[in-house]
Amino acid sequence: MAGEFGKFIDDKRRGRAAGGGDILLKDIATAMGITATYLSDIVKGRRNPPEMTMLNKIAEVLHLSSQETKELYDLAGRERNEAAPDLPDYLMDKEIPHVRAALRRASEKKLGDDFWKKVFDEIDKEGKD
């Protein structure tokens, strides 16, 4: 049964081909260098979502926006029960240990989405694009 990741790919490939048709799984698979059967197994939830390089190829073939690509990463990570694949390098950067400490502290205190929304807003005020 397809999970959220597979449903996302299925939804995003509809109507995105030149002329408004659907992008075929075999075309996505070819760009990824895998068989259509293997990709079909991923989309149907019989195999885990692929790693970052392959996710980027999916995003490219489907003409995903930056926001849609981030959603693709999140869904892949969630389905693999891992952090989204674009995050580990930043999370593990030894120059910024407070990232891990803050996440652990927030987890211990069971801080929810309301807290992280405030953090997100602060990052938008302070951060660099």
Identify the function of each model-found stretch.
Residues A18-D41:
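Short alpha-helical DNA-recognition segment
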Residues A18-K26, E51-L55, D86:
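Short, charged amphipathic recognition helices of the HTH superfamily
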